[in-house]
Amino acid sequence: MALPIRIDIVSDVVCPWCYIGKRRLESALQTLGEEVKAEIVYHPYELDPSVPKQGISFSEHMEKKFGPGRSESMFQRVEQVANEVGLDFDFSQLPKAISTFDLHRLLTVAYERGNQAETKEALLKAYFVDRIDLTQEAVLLQVLESAGWDKKEALEILKSDIARDSVEQEMNYFRQLGVTGVPFFILNNKYALSGAQPSETFVNALRQVIEESKPQVIAQADSCDLGSGEC
């Protein structure tokens, strides 16, 4: 019987390691198969709240943030690792650095709607693999439609303040917990893994949760044995 395990993931849509970590976790869950039944819940984290709503040039923003030499070598490594998990990253083709606050509002509502996983994957793929400009309303709505959204409903959320307080409160909560980088994984509200861990690390951590879920015998006395039938 599969053990139910809740996995809370603190992440940002524009974090490449969050996408890589997502793929590595998925690989781990595939390895475990029927040993676990995972409930995955995504939580908001803004890597750069200073980015304006209309976005800014990705290359210029990264050069300003890290310096031209460092950003280029850093992204080459990320592209290589992404390729190893089947993701086609090309940072030179990303049109914009974008604000993700509204995307987190959508993801918060998506959890209540039951399509958070689909929405998260669609947004990550659109940004990193398809490399499209998510600041364009029509484009974003098309992406959301592919994840099971009604365009009108999504637009109403974008035009409103729905889930704004929830997103801000969650981000404050995880900052207070000491989360300073993403992705950040919490297993059954007990164990935490920081960063895009290798799949094997996820497998080992999840198996530890499985082991600890089993009853621990703290005392033994006379009993009937199921195997031998003796009492």
Predicted regions and their residues:
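Structural alpha/beta surface segment adjacent to cysteine/selenocysteine redox centers
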Residues: 23-127, 224, 229-231
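C-terminal cap of thioredoxin/glutaredoxin-like
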Residues: 3, 7-11, 20-34, 42, ...
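Cys/His/Pro-rich metal-binding microdomains
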Residues: 16
